[in-house]
Amino acid sequence: MSRRTRLAVAALALSAILVVGLLVAFASLACPSDAPEQPCPGAVTNRIVVIGLAALAVGLLVVPFALLSEFVIRGRILYRGAWGRAIRRGLLAGASVALLGGLRIGGALTVPVAIFVVLLAGAIEWLAIRRFDAP
């Protein structure tokens, strides 16, 4: 693994930690005086921002770990397309988090729907491996 790749992996992991810190700060400061007699005026917007930040954090955190796992599995060699596969997996993980959060806000999240979303992400990755990563 080259120095540039190690630096990119570290930068992605640190940016994910930064986004998580931003998420925690926003969630703790968004509506500090939410009470039954005085509800938060921007509660829906705050929830959407929190879900977006969570999806971004998950996506940024999955990419370096997907790349590192491929590096270990393939015998400590990064083949062509490794970054593309890692980015695709990060996008799928972030989209799954965003979709589950959106379903939760809409009140449509149930256990079967959540299982379907996770299985759908797995099926998309399986089809992408067969279609794009075939030798």
Listing of model-derived features with the role each one plays in the protein:
Residues 46-49, 70-83:
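Short juxtamembrane and helix-loop transition motifs at transmembrane-helix boundaries
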Residues 99-115:
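Membrane-helix boundary connector in multi-pass membrane proteins
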Residues 118-129:
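Alpha-helical transmembrane segments and their membrane-interface exit regions
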Residues 19-36:
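Membrane-helix interface motif
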Residues 33-46:
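Perimembrane loop-to-helix junctions flanking transmembrane segments
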Residues 59-73:
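Membrane-water interface of transmembrane alpha-helices
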Residues 43-60:
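Alpha-helical transmembrane segments
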Residues 1-15, 47-48:
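Alpha-helical transmembrane segments and their helix-start/interface "positive-inside/aromatic belt" motifs
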